[in-house]
Amino acid sequence: NAVKNKKNYEVHFYLTLLVKIVITVSVMINSSNLIDQINHTKRVIESARQQNQWNLSILNTSVSPSEKVQKRLNEIIGSLPDRDVYNYTSPEILYQTTDVSKTQRTDFIDNYMEISYNVLEKVKVVDKNNKRLKPKDFTGKAVLLIPQKYEKDQERILKELGMEKTDIYFIKDRQVYQDMLSPGYYAIDPIIYAHKVKKQLWLPTGEILYSSKGASVLNEAIEQEKIDQSTLYLNTLKSENDVSVYNEQSRTLEAIFFVIMNISSYILCIVTITVIYLEFRKKEFGVYALYHRIPKKAILKFLCFNEVITLLSALMIEKEFLCFVLFEIVFCSLAIWKYFCRK
């Protein structure tokens, strides 16, 4: 029975170690994801707060209006001053980070965005001399704003985009722009096609944004034309941003609860390993206790063997998680010390 119990304890010990490997890796990965999620949520809130100050709106449609209504709306939109209408097309690739070093070089087409000149009032773009570009810097002719690092690739860029006759204006490298439609997401070093504002109901790509004055005029037109506002309505950027903020906060809370569950399992696993080890070496430690001695070599071997798992996991995932190693050493040492105090 003694031999059988010893084997059982040994099997349980190594099985628990295997479980610990899985749980430790899971805790660290999920903790790392939680930190990223918290940082992203902060950026979403900050970006949304900034965008809300612009007081812009988007015209949404669930059903295409009749040709007569479309014509009327196009007339009204066309009559709006340029300052009340903005065109914006996000690039295909957006990042959740503003750290340029963490981004990868992408195809020109994937990192291409379109804006009307007046968007430069909202989004800061600087030229190669670090001077901020303004709408008045351009005559109205469409232009490609290209990061200076692509200077040798300009012919290829024009060819790939099908814009051989478009003028090029070089801008400073490594610029980061907050996306106007997605708070907390950023365009990094994109090629920007800037053009005169297009005032029409829809664009082939991207969105048309309206100032509060432009939105007010459109709302009046929608009411006058007696259009069903469930099929055609103006939605403020603020209301859409509020949804984005709520969704990110919900994801953060879910991640927090998940990590709490992971950490609980992790602590339980450490307790189980320590208890099994002490039971496994109970007779040997009992002899040491009779002579009021502590088997330092055996305990040190256990601690080292146990902490190697946590140490390797931390080095592979996040070095900041090396604090888990210290926690385990302190926890296991206290548990073993308390065990010997009772003997």
Map each language-model feature to its residues.
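Selective transmembrane-helix segments that form parts of the transport pathway or gating/packing helices
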Residues: 300-318
